[in-house]
Curated annotation (Swiss-Prot):
The keyword Phosphoprotein does not apply. Its EC number is 5.4.99.12. HAMAP family: TruA (MF_00171). Formation of pseudouridine at positions 38, 39 and 40 in the anticodon stem and loop of transfer RNAs. It holds the Pfam family PseudoU_synth_1. PANTHER family: PSEUDOURIDYLATE SYNTHASE, TRNA PSEUDOURIDINE SYNTHASE-LIKE 1. This is tRNA pseudouridine synthase A. The keyword Phosphoprotein does not apply. SUPFAM superfamilies: Pseudouridine synthase (SSF55120). It comes from Pyrobaculum aerophilum (strain ATCC 51768 / DSM 7523 / JCM 9630 / CIP 104966 / NBRC 100827 / IM2). It comes from the Archaea. One of its GO terms (molecular function) is RNA binding. Coiled coil: none annotated. Substrate binds at Y94.
Length: 256
C-alpha cells in the first residue's frame, strides 16, 4: 500500500528536490528506499512547507526524522490507494517574497488579475526540451500584499510549469516598477514568446501546500522543530529570510 509523507525543507540546504547528487531526494531514498512519486520537483533554493513524497513503506515519523538531513523534516503521513498520483493535486499554493523597492503595489495587483485564469503561459515557462510540454493551464488566484518593507505574492492553482511562478513573480515586480506595462503582459499572454521573461531569484519562493482529498496523521513535534528552525534562520531582513519566516508561520497554522 502506498503512503504519502508531508515534508518541509530549507531549499538553500539542497541542490533542488531531485535530479542532482546533492538534491534532497537521494537522501530520502536512503531512508525510504524507492520513491514512487513526489508532489513537486522544487528548484535549488526553493523551500517547502507541504511538499510530499510517496513510498511503499509505512514508517514511524519519529524514526524518519532521526534519519532526515539537517534542514528537512517529515511531519505527516497518510495511506493512499493503489494508483494514487501525487502530481494530480486539487490545489497548489506558493508564496514569493521580495523586498519592496518602491514598486506600485496597485499596478502589481492589476497585473495579477490579468495573469489569473486559463491561458497559454508559454512566455512564463522555461521549456525543458520536451516536444509536447503543455503550456495551457489555470491559475486560480494571485494575491499581492505589502507587509512593511516586503512584498508577499501568493499563488494558487492546480499545476504550475517549470519556473512559471518565478517568471510571473518577476513580471509582476517589473510591472510595479514600470519596466513592463499591463498591456505588455497582456501581449505576452496573447502572443506567447518563450524565453521573454526572466526568473526571479529562487530563494524568495516557498511551496506552502499541496492539497489532496487525504487526511494526514501529523507529527506535531516535527512541526515545532521545523517552525523553530525557520524562525531562527529568518533573523536577518532579506527576501529569503522573510520567506523562511513565512514558511514557519505556515507550519504553525497546522497546529492551530
Amino acid at each position: 500500500m502506498p503512503y504519502l509523507y508531508r515534508i518541509a525543507y530549507d531549499g538553500t540546504m539542497f541542490y533542488g528536490f531531485t535530479g542532482h547528487p546533492n538534491s534532497l531526494e537521494p537522501r530520502l531514498r536512503l531512508i525510504f528506499g524507492e520513491i514512487l512519486g513526489r508532489g513537486s520537483r522544487t528548484d535549488p533554493g526553493v523551500s517547502a512547507v507541504g511538499n510530499v513524497v510517496m513510498t511503499g513503506r509505512k514508517m514511524a515519523l519519529g524514526y524518519v526524522n532521526s534519519k532526515m538531513p539537517k534542514g528537512a523534516w517529515a511531519w505527516g503521513i497518510a495511506e493512499v490507494p493503489e494508483g494514487f498520483n501525487p502530481r494530480r493535486a486539487k490545489l497548489r499554493r506558493y508564496l514569493y517574497v521580495a523586498p519592496h523597492w518602491g514598486e506600485d503595489v496597485d499596478v502589481m495587483r492589476e497585473a495579477a488579475k490579468l495573469l489569473t485564469g486559463t491561458h497559454d503561459y508559454s512566455s512564463f515557462i522555461q521549456l525543458r526540451g520536451e516536444k509536447h510540454t503543455p503550456t495551457v493551464t489555470t491559475v486560480y488566484d494571485i494575491d499581492v500584499t505589502l507587509r512593511g518593507d516586503l512584498i508577499f505574492i501568493y499563488f494558487a492553482g492546480r499545476g504550475f510549469r517549470n519556473k512559471m511562478i518565478r517568471k510571473m513573480a518577476w513580471a509582476l515586480l517589473a510591472a510595479g516598477r514600470g519596466v513592463l506595462s499591463v498591456d505588455d503582459l497582456a501581449d505576452l499572454l496573447k502572443k506567447p514568446r518563450p524565453g521573454a521573461v526572466p526568473s526571479a531569484p529562487a530563494e524568495g519562493l516557498v511551496l506552502l501546500d499541496i492539497v489532496y482529498d487525504v487526511k494526514f496523521e501529523v507529527d506535531f513535534s516535527a512541526l515545532r522543530k521545523a517552525y523553530v528552525y525557520f524562525l531562527s534562520k529568518s533573523r536577518h531582513l532579506s527576501a529569503h529570510a522573510a520567506a523562511l519566516r513565512a514558511a514557519g508561520e505556515a507550519l504553525a497554522m497546522w497546529e492551530s
